[in-house]
Amino acid sequence: MLWIYKGETFNPIDTPTYYGFIYRLLFEDNDGNEYTYYGQKKLWSNTTKTALLSGDKRKYHHRFFSKNIKGKRIQCEEILSPSTNWRAYKGSMNEIPNGLRLSYKEILMFCDTKMDLTYWETSILFKEDVLFDRFNLNMNVGGKFFAGKITGSKTYE
């Protein structure tokens, strides 16, 4: 299943240069009820490896990282930024609840920084009132506010 962005199928040849995106997933049950899930997904995954002694760049090279060792600045680590599995991504839930099937994947917006990504995800989760909506599968906001812990919210499952 492909991602939809602004009503059209989103499948670029190259991964975009954005940091990540905010998404909405729609699930359906056998009775035709729709359930939503909101989240964020990074497009890049940074890893650090020891730099090659030859000075060559590895695949997915982003930049070299220097350290001050015994008063000398030595290029000793390389930061790699391979693309994440965002094309096949199906949400950060551990598993899809029984009886539900994924019916729609939508990109709501792209973000340039990690701070933007966290802010806009949190903003959307509060705006959509996810902790009180029984047709929403999000069970917490930012790891701080949990369904079932706030008066009047849905029960935590």
What are these regions (language model features)?
Residues 6, 19, 31, 38, ...:
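Feature targets compositionally biased, intrinsically disordered low-complexity regions
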Residues 1-51, 152-157:
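GIY-YIG nuclease catalytic motif and its immediate N-terminal context
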Residues 1-17, 103, 108-157:
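Boundary/linker segments flanking structured domains
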Residues 36, 47, 64, 136-138:
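Poly-acidic low-complexity segments
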Residues 41-114:
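Conserved short loop/helix modules at catalytic or binding sites
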